[in-house]
């Protein structure tokens, strides 16, 4: 049985039981999967959770995101710091507004799950990121600035919206104004800023051709 067939069976079943979360036992029994098919079912369910098509609750039950007041999608962060979750499944409600204080450490283009608030400002639908399913980037191109025994990289992509802290041992001999590639070692979480290590020095800001090199490198840093 194909993975696509299993996935469709699960989604059809969940749609018909959307009013409440479903246990693994009920799902396996009602779909009548057995033997290797049952193992394939559990494997596909874990992939669906990872993809944000299903949500696993703390009670070890499964539900559809929209039936639980959740939205799964790619986060688009604006240069002003707030963002929008663009749903994987298009709906009449459209994108979900996320205030900067409710990004919860998520960064531009990450795949996230957000909880929809009951009341948004001015009647606008808004929410809060509650889970980061997939990071879109782990490396960023930016400009290095040193400040004593630490430094930081300001990403060229202004939609990232935050500097990345770098400890002295991770400078890779970078100097003020260097264009660098920095790899995240500690992800932001809403309370703590991102930390990283410099993996490559591209050249000095303003060098001939450095802008083109930086753009190419930045595209190479995309994970998905």
Where are these regions (language model features)?
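Charge-lined substrate channels and their catalytic hotspots, especially those that engage the 3′ end
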Residues: 1-223
């Amino acid at each position: 049985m194909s993975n696509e067939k299993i996935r469709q069976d699960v989604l059809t079943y969940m749609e018909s039981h959307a009013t409440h979360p479903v246990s693994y036992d009920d799902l396996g029994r009602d779909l009548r999967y057995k033997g290797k098919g049952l193992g394939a079912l559990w494997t596909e369910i874990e992939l669906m959770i990872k993809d944000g098509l299903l949500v696993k609750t703390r009670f070890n039950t499964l539900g559809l995101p929209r039936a639980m007041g959740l939205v799964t999608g790619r986060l688009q962060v604006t240069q002003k710091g707030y963002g929008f979750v663009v749903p994987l499944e298009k709906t009449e409600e459209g994108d979900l507004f996320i205030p900067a204080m409710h990004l919860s450490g998520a960064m531009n283009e990450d795949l996230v799950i957000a909880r929809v608030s009951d009341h948004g400002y001015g009647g606008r639908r808004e929410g809060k990121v509650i889970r980061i399913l997939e990071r879109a980037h782990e490396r960023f191109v930016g400009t290095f600035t040193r400040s004593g025994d630490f430094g930081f990289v300001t990403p060229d992509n202004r939609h990232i919206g935050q500097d990345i802290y770098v400890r002295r041992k991770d400078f890779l001999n970078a100097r003020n104004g260097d264009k660098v590639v920095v790899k995240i070692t500690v992800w932001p979480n809403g309370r703590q800023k991102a930390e990283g290590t410099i993996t490559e020095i591209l050249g000095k800001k303003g060098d001939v051709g450095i802008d083109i090199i930086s753009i190419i490198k930045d595209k190479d840093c995309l994970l998905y």
